[in-house]
Structures are given as structure tokens and as C-alpha cells.
Amino acid sequence: LFRTSTPCFGSCWGLQVATVAAGGTVRKNPDGREIGIGRRIEIAEAGHGHGLYLGKPRIFDAITVHLDEVETLAPGTTVLSTNAWSPVQAAEIDTPGGGGFWGTQYHPEYTFREIAAVFRRYGDILIKHVLFTYAAAPAAYSPALHAALASPAPRPLVWKYGLDEAVLDPAVRSRELRNWIEQAVLPARSTRGRE
């Protein structure tokens, strides 16, 4: 796929697989699993003005779940955002065919419903890694995440979990996907004579 002019996008494992396919490496994050809300993701210098982040705040939170992370950048990689948990939260990889790859470590495609399901699925693992201290805690957190789907989200919930527009507003939360379509896919499509 990288040898074609087709633009590619991937989140989480998508970024990791693309990194390895392009010659970089991935490792288990020594800080453990980043899960729930990835905090204070900051657009890097190279990310300012990049198509992925048009209309996105300079520092934002995002729904996330990952244990692995990019360790060594592949040749032709530009880091677009970072945070204290993982130095590569988003990247662009130049590809031989010119289509390019844009990827995020976090999940702009997730809603609170998806991350709530992840908490239920990983409950025992989260307790083992001391992200929760008692067995019922992950399951108890799930209804709170479902409640965040309401518009507007309940104010006590917003305060308790430190949620803001970047994760609560679907248009802001998924902006990277729309930007990729508008900034990479549609221009590539039009160069192929497709409207």
C-alpha cells in the first residue's frame, strides 16, 4: 500500500504497524498502559499548520488505549504531537508511492461507548497494573463514560473526570479523521480524475 499514491490513516496499532513497515521500531511502553483519556497531548512544532491538526487546540485530551508505542522513528517520519506518556502521539510517514501515512497513537474514532467497553474487557488487567484498586472499579467507571455521551454531558461528571470539549464534542474529538479525508484523501482522489 505504501508503494501506491493512496493516502493511509491508522490509529493505535495502525501507527505502530505503519512505523514497523516503514523501518522503525515499536516497544512495550515502560510507563505501562495509557488508557481512558490521554492527557495534555501537545501539537509539536512540525504539527502546527499540518493538515491533521487544522481546527484542533494546541494542547488537548483524547480517548486512548495502548500498551505499545513507537520507539524508533521510521525514515521519513515527522512527529506531529506528543505527551508525557508517549513521545509519539501522532506522526506523518512519507511513503514511496507518495500517498503518505498519517497516524495517531490515540483513538479519534472512539466514542465513550467504545472506551467503556475496553474498561469492561480489561478489568482484571487494569487492577493487576494498579490503575484501579478494587475489582468492581472498572465496571463502575463504564456507566460514567456512557453518561458522557449525553449532550450536554452531566456537569458533575465533567468536573470529576476533567473532561473538556476536546473529548466531549464529537466534531472536535474526531477532527483528525475529517481533516485526513479533506486534506489528504479528497486531493488525492481529484488528482486521479475522480470527483
Residue map of PLM features:
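Cysteine-nucleophile active-site neighborhood
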Residues: 1-47
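Amide-donor transfer/coupling interface in amidating biosynthetic enzymes
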Residues: 3, 43-195
